[in-house]
Every structure is written in structure tokens, then in C-alpha cells.
Curated annotation (Swiss-Prot):
Keywords (A to Z) from UniProt: Cell inner membrane, Cell membrane, Membrane, Polysaccharide transport, Sugar transport, Transmembrane, Transmembrane helix, Transport
PANTHER family: INNER MEMBRANE TRANSPORT PERMEASE, TRANSPORT PERMEASE PROTEIN
Residue ranges crossing the lipid bilayer per the database entry: 31-51, 63-83, 109-129, 139-159, 173-193, 201-221, 229-249
Domain ABC transmembrane type-2 stretches: 32-252
Record protein name field: O-antigen export system permease protein RfbA
Species in which this protein is naturally found: Myxococcus xanthus
Record bears the keyword Cell membrane: yes
GO BP terms in the entry: lipopolysaccharide transport; polysaccharide transport
Primary location: membrane
Statement: the UniProt record of this protein carries the keyword Repressor: no
Cellular component per GO, a single term: plasma membrane
């Protein structure tokens, strides 16, 4: 893990260059360009608002804002994991022609989507203020939650990217699992809607994204401190998972260029 972090720092210029390149290329040639950073989550929100408030008649106060608070970090997570799984196998040109630090590829995917997440935050804050929900001092813990999500997302992405080099079906499996994972995470509904306390505890234990989503909702929607115990447990698990992911990555590093 130390070697991986050291090499990421050593090749930080390359990482920044890849992130900038991806951000510029993502909407190049489109008429609206950079505006899609805001339009994508907004269109997602409108579809779910229509479904849950008109069709299913959910009665959650300020539902569009509630959903947006969870939707933005979920989009960051899902696009990072979905795109990161194939980050190495899709860049055979780089790995076979030059001595290239493979860990930069999945990292650049995660960081690129993190940038999109951060750029979308003003839209979320404006939406909240439109509903009379102004940010409170609890936002000081927002960077902590983001750091925990970043650690967990990087760990999962490294593992998937390493495995996908030899098992290409994984990227398609991940894409479908993310859809199921989304509905098993309280993004479109509060965790409190699950009446059974044992079921809620099981969700917190088995689904790492639950504590992240409820933490964002606590900070921006409920204006309170996140529940410390599940969040700190996830932080510890994420660090251990990142260590394991870096070990897997190191053990397979030499195989990447040969396998793809």
C-alpha cells in the first residue's frame, strides 16, 4: 500500500494530466458541453421525482432535495466503479508500449468522477436553499465523509480493475450489480422507511454505501452530525480494503501487459 501511494505521488503530474484530459474529452463535440455536468444529475432527479411523487405518491418533505443529496455521491461511486473496472483492460496501448504505472488508470477514473461530483455541489446547495434548507455548521464533516467514500471507492476499483484484466465478463457483471446496489441503498428513500430495526442494522452491516448516504443526508438534509459508529467502522474497513486491494494490485502488476 505504501508503494502504491508513493508511486501515485511520484506520478501525480501524469494523474492530473489524465484527469484533465478526461474532463475535456467527456463532453467534447456536444453542444451543451460542460453543462452536462449539471444536466445529467438533474435529469436523473426529475425522472425519480416524477416516479416517486406522482406515480408512487411518496410523501417525503422536500423530496427533490433529499434525493439529490444522495444521488450526487451515488453517481460518483457508480460511474467510478463501473468505469474503473475496465480502466486497465481498456488501455492496452499505454501498458504495452511504455513503462506505465498501472494504478494511475483506475485512480484517474475515480478522481475524474470526484471532480464532477464537486462541480455539481453548487447545484445541490442552490436546490436546498430554494427549499429553505441552508447549509449549517455540520458541513465541516462533509470532507471527512468524502474522504471515506474516496478510500472505499479506490479500494473497490483497484480490485475490480485487477481482476477484470483476466476475467473480462466482470465489467458487465459489475454494471448490473450496481443497478441492484442502487435500489438497495437509501438514495430514493430514507433509511427510516424500513420499519424492522434488525433489517436496518443488517443493511448497515452489509451495504457500505448505507452509512455514506445517511451521513450525507444527515449533514445537508437533516442538519445534524452523522452517526459516528457506522461511519468510523466503514472508515476502518475502507483502509483495510485499500491495503488488501493494493496487495492484489502489486501481485498482479507484472501480468497486466501480458494478459491484455
Amino acid at each position: 500500500m505504501i508503494r502504491l501511494v508513493r508511486e501515485l505521488y511520484q506520478y501525480r503530474g501524469l494523474l492530473i494530466s489524465l484527469v484533465q484530459r478526461e474532463l475535456k474529452a467527456r463532453y467534447r463535440g456536444s453542444f451543451l458541453g460542460f453543462l452536462w455536468t449539471f444536466l445529467n444529475p438533474t435529469l436523473h432527479m426529475l425522472v425519480y421525482v416524477l416516479l416517486f411523487t406522482v406515480v408512487m405518491r411518496q410523501n417525503i418533505p422536500n423530496f427533490p432535495f433529499f434525493m439529490f443529496v444522495g444521488l450526487l455521491p451515488w453517481i460518483w461511486f457508480s460511474t467510478s466503479v463501473g468505469g474503473g473496472a475496465s480502466a486497465i483492460s481498456d488501455r492496452r496501448d499505454l501498458l504495452t508500449k511504455v513503462r506505465f504505472p498501472a494504478q494511475v488508470l483506475p485512480t484517474s477514473v475515480v478522481v475524474t468522477n470526484l471532480c464532477n461530483f464537486v462541480l455539481s455541489l453548487p447545484l445541490m446547495l442552490v436546490l436546498g436553499m430554494a427549499y429553505g434548507q441552508w447549509p449549517t455548521w455540520h458541513v465541516v464533516l462533509f470532507p471527512v465523509v468524502v474522504l471515506i467514500q474516496l478510500t472505499f471507492t479506490l479500494a473497490l476499483t483497484y480490485i475490480l480493475a485487477a481482476i477484470n484484466v483476466t476475467f473480462r465478463d466482470l465489467q458487465h457483471i459489475v454494471s448490473n450489480l450496481l443497478t441492484l446496489w442502487f435500489f438497495a441503498t437509501p438514495v430514493l428513500y430514507p433509511l427510516s422507511t424500513i420499519q424492522d430495526e434488525s433489517a436496518r442494522s443488517l443493511m448497515l452491516a452489509l451495504n457500505p454505501m448505507v452509512s455514506l448516504m445517511t451521513s450525507y443526508q444527515a449533514i445537508f438534509y437533516e442538519h445534524r452530525l452523522p452517526d459516528a459508529e457506522p461511519l468510523m467502522a466503514l472508515a476502518a474497513v475502507s483502509v483495510v480494503l485499500l491495503w488488501a486491494a493494493s496487495s492484489i494490485f502489486e501481485s498482479r502488476r507484472e501480468e497486466f501487459a501480458e494478459s491484455i
